[in-house]
Swiss-Prot record:
Family under the similarity heading: Belongs to the LutC/YkgG family.
HAMAP family attached to this UniProt entry: LutC
Protein name (record): Lactate utilization protein C
Cited InterPro entries: FTHF_cligase-like_sf (IPR024185), LUD_dom (IPR003741), LutC (IPR022823), NagB/RpiA_transferase-like (IPR037171)
Length: 241
């Protein structure tokens, strides 16, 4: 359960705001408004998971991202092919139980190292060294916790073994996406996060919304890829998960 912290000087701060507005501070009778029009819920409304996947695939070329479909059984070979296509290691990954659930542990800990492919699995006890590994890595690999079909965005919940820099510092980023994680858009992701907070569940202090490789553009619409993050990105969708 999420622990409630102590808020200091809240009443004083709110009273200052109320004074500036020229009214008394409201301490009761405040309710969340109900908006008559809520178009955010109608985007891809009623879509099946297959239809959401097609929407995600259609968006990927627009965000300069390759999308590859595979199955849980074929995931290991698919991942090996994608990594090789991007130039191989060094590789950095999260310390995530899903790698074991998807049959990738042997690849990370044995097969690639035996082929002289350097693999670093995030180690919370190593501190800054993890960031150094990520900085030198050619490929970073994580799972997507929620995937937004409309924008082609993967949502990552950072944590003790799930450092932000795994998806940020390597030249290439690979996201493994379970098809079941695909939702229409940001609306559903925000609703899920809000629901977890309402239930008192612990929410990561860092939640990242990543839409393909790093893209930067100036006022003249000159696009530069890779300035603030990976130069390339690939989404591997596991269609039977």
């Amino acid at each position: 359960m999420m622990q409630t912290g102590t808020i200091h000087n809240r009443d004083k701060f709110l009273q200052t705001v109320a004074n500036r507005l020229g009214r008394h501070q409201r301490t009761s009778g405040v309710s969340r408004p109900h908006w008559r029009h809520q178009p955010q819920w109608t985007v891809f409304q009623g879509y099946s998971q297959d239809e959401l996947l097609e929407a995600l695939k259609a968006q990927c070329p627009r965000i300069h991202t390759q999308c590859v479909e595979t199955t849980a059984v074929e995931l290991k070979e698919t991942l090996k092919e994608v990594v090789a296509k991007h130039g191989g290691g060094p590789i950095v990954t999260w310390d995530d139980p899903r790698f074991d659930e998807y049959g990738l542990t042997r690849l990370l800990r044995n097969e690639w190292p035996n082929e002289n492919v350097d693999v670093h699995i995030w180690d919370a006890s190593a501190g800054r060294k993890n960031i150094d590994y990520a900085e030198q890595a050619n490929v970073g690999i994580t799972f997507s916790d929620i995937t937004l079909a409309e924008s082609g965005t993967v949502v990552l919940f950072s944590g003790n073994g799930k450092g932000r820099t795994v998806s940020f510092l390597p030249k290439t980023y690979i996201a493994i996406i379970a098809k079941s994680t695909i939702v229409p858009r940001m609306t559903q992701a925000a609703a899920y996060i809000h629901e977890q907070i309402e239930k008192g569940h612990l929410i990561p202090s860092c939640i990242n919304f990543i839409t393909g490789p790093s893209n930067s553009a100036d006022i003249e619409m000159n696009l530069v890829v890779g300035v603030h993050g990976p130069m390339k990105a690939t989404y591997i969708v596991v269609t039977d998960r």
